[in-house]
């Protein structure tokens, strides 16, 4: 494992020790927790109420950052961080501190605490710093995109990008591209199915979903197809997918080990991470150069993707456009493929839900035969299914903010500058927050229940995921086309085991059977 190699190189001085078992069972609830609001602000003058407890009094997983990291390394707990976080909340309560190597944070999971966190974020919200990613941009002389930027530089770029990437008007323009890609995936599946004498297809869709998501997102970004749904896709695009997976795999340990030491000694972990980013930028640059040349030649055409629109607007410099398009391209593969895979699995083992969704799609199409946008707005249960998948299987297991001012949560003083993480995985599976929490029930999102700050898979506010609308629309159209054309089944009804590799993914992809309708 890359993490173990790096740990040996920088942590040989750490002593062997007894370690906690961090692979806890699924959430069983806090035995002593009340969900009553326990949120307070610091006084206007910055002073704290007399009963407020100091930051150091917050329950902690251990006071030695490197000792804690060694425990994680020794037990290979990086892959089970979501389960470790779940266990920590169960043992320590709704708020706790954690030190892991270079990483210090306060972790919370109750919606009222999350609300207070976001209320305090200001106009320049700051997420967790991805130092290895930023270092790559610096070493290769690449501009940073909005994922890595902060402050006014982030805000100015984000406002411009929102118009084409996140606004409803922008979605309407790229909606046909995603619909075409989703329909083509059905054709792709039917071709494979035609080679089976049984008239069905049993398959692990893991790799195929990566191909689809890159094909669809690139079509939206560049207005051109990559050919990933063809029988023999381009080798460079497959290398791109592999590079994205490598970036995710290597990012997790790089969050906790001193990247300066890894860089100095040119460790395997560091070099693989840097090389993977190089591959990503090379492929993105090939796509970008094609569009840029056509733009410079002044070829007239209709809407042809987000990058072309940004070039026409001329509000962002070219290097900023390249940086943000590359981030969107890299960020639109695994992060969309995994929710698709988990949703297909849950629908396969919940046939009644699958039937209800199929019927909703049939009725919506009958009522909106010529308006794709209105059709998508007529699928509340399908949108509930996507929320339900992301509740149980959040792509990222936390949402983070660096505090810009002191706040008080649960009578604990948390100073400005502290990294506060919202535990999405334990929140989504908590019986205190969701009735029958482990049951896949899309209809729960249609009921008149308080769901505020309980659906945060894409983040919140001005710093929510920039690719949110692309991902939501892509997932909705994909599921709509698949459910119209195929019955989805699985033999195994057991819960799927998950691992964390900077995003949540199945330990072993499920085997699914597709039958034409």
Curated annotation (Swiss-Prot):
Keyword set, alphabetical order: Heme, Iron, Membrane, Metal-binding, Mitochondrion, Monooxygenase, Oxidoreductase, Steroidogenesis, Transit peptide
A biological process from GO: C21-steroid hormone biosynthetic process
Reactions this protein catalyses: a steroid + 2 reduced [adrenodoxin] + O2 + 2 H(+) = an 11beta-hydroxysteroid + 2 oxidized [adrenodoxin] + H2O
Amino-acid positions noted as binding heme in the UniProt annotation, renumbered to this chain: 465
Organelle transit peptide residues: 1-45
Coarse class of the protein's main subcellular location: mitochondrion
Subcellular location: Mitochondrion membrane
SUPFAM superfamilies associated with the record: Cytochrome P450 (SSF48264)
One GO MF term: heme binding
Pfam families in the record: p450
Presence of the UniProt keyword DNA-binding in the record: no
Cofactor(s) required, per the database record: heme
Cellular component GO terms, alphabetical: mitochondrial inner membrane
Enzyme Commission (EC) number: 1.14.15.4
Family recorded in the similarity comment: Belongs to the cytochrome P450 family.
Function, in words: Has 11 beta-hydroxylation, 18-hydroxylation activities and aldosterone synthetic activity. Catalyzes the final steps of glucocorticoid and mineralocorticoid biosynthesis.
Name of the featured protein: Cytochrome P450 11B, mitochondrial
Organism from which the protein derives: Aquarana catesbeiana
């Amino acid at each position: 494992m890359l993490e173990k190699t790096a740990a040996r190189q920088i942590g040989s001085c750490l002593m062997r020790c007894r370690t906690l078992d961090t692979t806890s069972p699924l959430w069983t609830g806090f035995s002593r927790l009340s969900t009553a609001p326990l949120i307070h602000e610091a006084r206007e003058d910055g002073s704290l109420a007399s009963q407020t407890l100091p930051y150091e009094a917050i329950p902690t997983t251990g006071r030695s950052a490197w000792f804690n990291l060694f425990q994680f390394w020794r037990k290979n707990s990086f892959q089970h961080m979501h389960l470790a976080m779940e266990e920590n909340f169960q043992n320590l309560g709704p708020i706790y501190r954690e030190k892991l190597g270079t990483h210090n944070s306060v972790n919370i999971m109750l919606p009222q605490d999350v609300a207070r966190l976001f209320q305090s974020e200001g106009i320049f919200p700051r997420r967790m710093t991805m130092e290895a990613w930023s270092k790559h941009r610096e070493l290769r002389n690449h501009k940073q995109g909005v994922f890595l930027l902060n402050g006014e530089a982030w805000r100015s770029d984000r406002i411009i990008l929102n118009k084409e990437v996140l606004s409803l008007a922008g979605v309407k323009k790229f909606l046909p591209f995603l619909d075409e890609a989703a329909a083509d995936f059905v054709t792709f599946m039917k071709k494979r199915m035609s080679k089976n004498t049984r008239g069905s297809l049993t398959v692990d869709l893991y790799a195929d979903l990566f191909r689809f998501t890159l094909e669809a997102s690139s079509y939206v970004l560049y207005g051109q197809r990559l050919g990933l749904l063809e029988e023999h896709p381009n080798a460079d695009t497959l290398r791109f997918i592999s590079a994205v997976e490598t970036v995710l795999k290597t990012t997790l340990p790089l969050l906790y080990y001193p990247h300066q030491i890894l860089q100095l000694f040119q460790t395997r972990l560091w070099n693989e991470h840097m090389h993977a980013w190089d591959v990503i930028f090379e492929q993105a640059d090939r796509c970008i150069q094609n569009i840029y040349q056509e733009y410079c030649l002044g070829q007239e055409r209709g809407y042809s993707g987000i990058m072309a629109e940004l070039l026409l607007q001329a509000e962002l410099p070219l290097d900023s456009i390249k940086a943000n398009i590359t981030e969107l391209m890299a960020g639109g593969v695994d992060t969309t493929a995994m929710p698709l895979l988990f949703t297909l699995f849950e629908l396969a083992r919940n046939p009644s839900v699958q039937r209800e969704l199929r019927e909703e799609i049939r009725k919506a199409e009958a009522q909106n035969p010529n308006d794709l946008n209105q059709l998508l707005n007529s699928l509340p249960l399908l949108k509930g299914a996507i929320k339900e998948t992301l509740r149980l299987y959040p792509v990222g297991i936390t949402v983070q903010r660096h505090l810009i001012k002191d706040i008080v949560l649960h009578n604990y003083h948390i100073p400005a500058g502290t990294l506060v993480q919202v535990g999405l995985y334990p929140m989504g599976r908590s019986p205190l927050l969701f009735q029958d929490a482990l049951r896949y029930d899309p209809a729960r999102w249609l009921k008149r229940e308080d769901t505020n700050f309980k659906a945060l898979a894409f983040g919140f506010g001005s710093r929510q995921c920039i690719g949110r609308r692309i991902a939501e629309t892509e997932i909705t159209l994909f599921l709509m086309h698949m459910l119209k054309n195929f019955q989805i089944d699985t033999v195994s009804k057991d819960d799927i085991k998950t691992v964390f590799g900077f995003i949540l993914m199945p330990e072993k992809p499920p085997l699914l059977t597709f039958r034409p309708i």
